[in-house]
Amino acid sequence: GLSTWFDDAGEPNMNRTYLSSLFGRKIKAPYSLSDMAADALGVLDSLEIDKAHLIGASMGGMIVQEIAINHPTRVRTMCSIMSNTGDRRNGGIAASLISKLVGRPKPTLETAVEDNVETFRLIAGPHFDAEEHREHAQAQVSRSFLPEGVERQMSAIASTRDRTTLLSSV
C-alpha cells in the first residue's frame, strides 16, 4: 500500500532473479510472501477479526495460501484466484510470454498505463478489453507508481517455497 516504502531495499536484479528461479537457485528478496501474510494478519488483528473468509488474486492468492498454511485457525474459507502453489513446473506464465515480459524497459510515469495495458493484453488473450483495462490501469498509476515495488514483489514470489504439499492439508 501507501504506508510503507522500501527504498533502502534497493531494486532487485530481475534478470538474475529469473535465471536463479529457472535453475532452482536460492533467491534473496527484500521481503517474502510470509512477511506480506503477517501484514495481512496484522490488519485483521487491528480490526479485532479472529477468523475471516480470505480471497486473493494472483500474488494475493499466494498470500492467502501462506495464511491458510501457517495460521489455519484464522481462516474460515480461502479462495485463491489466478494464482499458483509455487510449483515451478505448473501454473506459471506460458513460455511464449516470458520473452515478451522479461527484459522489457522499466515503465516511466509517462509510459506506465500503456505498459500495464500491454502486459495484461499479453496475459489475457484475444478477449481482452484494452479500453476498459486502460481505465483501471490509469487509476492504479494515479494512486501509486512504484516500479521498484513491483520488482520487489516479483522477487518475493520467486523466492517462496512450493506450497503444493502443504496446501493438501488446508
Language model segments and positions:
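Glycine-rich "HGGG/HGxG" loop immediately N-terminal to the catalytic nucleophile
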Residues: 1-31
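Short beta-strand/loop motif that positions the catalytic acidic residue
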Residues: 169-170
